[in-house]
């Protein structure tokens, strides 16, 4: 980094754990004061920092190296860390623009919480809750009352996360779309729907939601308990996340590797 005239800034608690005598910033303050973020961890670490970057409005790229398990988003391996960092600092690395989602929870016409997420917004019942009725609209058009354990509104980037696990489609991350996927629907014909990016999805619990166990979660990082007739509004965010790509693999190579396609 010295050769590139770059001053590294470490996250405060991480530097303390490693007993590093370096410049540090709190995690929430990092995006506003740096030109690039290097993440070492799994997809959860990336999602946590992606939300912070989006909330601050910082227009900075992220280089994510997989120190975790599966690592769909943190696709750069440890062996590729230094070559990838060199390309990023030289300005020759390839960047993806990953679309994000904006989620607003409204109660009695008042905003309870607003979040920006990269993967998905999930509405789900508690372990001891009955099956829910979720009234779903897209814009001004009513879609259906879904009887299900929950519902996922995912971005194309999030299509390979929880959405994929419950039978949703894989959507290329550069496609401009939203994905609406029911979780364990009572009716088998309630299938996932791919929507235009300009859509606003509105989800309202109307039955099975009066036991204080229904929650909406944002990228699995943060959750809010829902009441009956709360409305969860999900739409495409105005900004996107700049994510450095692995230097030696394209998106389909990542799918083959992570999903073990064509392996016996």
Model-derived features with residue positions:
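Catalytic core of DAGKc-family lipid kinases
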Residues: 69-149
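ATP/NTP phosphate-donor binding region
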Residues: 1-36, 40, 79-94, 105-115
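Short glycine/serine/threonine-rich phosphate/pyrophosphate-binding segments
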Residues: 44-50, 160-165
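Redox-cofactor binding/interface segments in oxidoreductases and associated redox assembly factors
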Residues: 39, 47, 153
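ATP/nucleoside-binding phosphotransfer catalytic cores, i.e., glycine-rich phosphate-binding loops
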Residues: 123, 139-142, 190-264
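Short, acidic/small-residue loops that bind anionic groups at enzyme active sites
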Residues: 57-75
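N-terminal glycine-rich "phosphate-gripper" loop used for MgATP/nucleotide binding
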Residues: 39-43, 51-54
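Gly/Ser/Thr-rich active-site loops/lids in small-molecule metabolic enzymes
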Residues: 141-189
